[in-house]
Amino acid sequence: MASFARLWIRDSSAGVGTLTFYEPESRVFAGLGHAICDVDTGEEMPLLAGDIVDAHINGCYKGTKGAAGELCGVFGNRVMGSLAVNGNTGVYGVMNAGNAPSGKAIPVALRQEVKTGPAQIISTVDGKAPQYYDVEITKIYSGPDTQVKNMIVEVTDSALIEKTGGIVQGMSGSPIIQNGMLVGAVTHVFVNNPLQGYGIFAESMLHTAENVAATQEKQAS
């Protein structure tokens, strides 16, 4: 499992997002933790085709109360993989051979294993190197109507607060680690309080990734 900054492209627009996890056997990756939506209508965009490319984060507009911040990045030259699904739990696709991200494998937590309390997120907020930052999971929603906004995460890391003001656009997909397990991904920031945001259960993203892997295997056979 590894976290890297990526740029997600559609038609004539692009945005910075974060890779949440990668499964090396199938080469399937997952990111964002929410759908890519049309900037004008807010509707989930149908996906015809798309690529992910490496990105270098070269700046940040800090988040403040009432104004969400944003990571600023530039495109790399190498296409890392192709997108296959844009859905409410995130974006999914297949990494090109030879482009596997580095990192060690960790288990994915079941939703009942996620607890309130200390955790960490992995995010790239400058350069290309992902870093761990301290957060607190303050609330967990586990009902049937909470498919995406499953938890509230609060940034407690002074270094991250100094750099970004908290959670900013572009950090969507940042893995949430607790007790040595991948428990979720950051999805949204609270505009009225950039220290806080929503997260999605990693288990939900894994289910979609497994479906993508099964589809890819079927198409290859």
What does each model-identified segment do?
Residues 1-221:
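C-terminal recognition in membrane/secretory proteostasis and scaffolding
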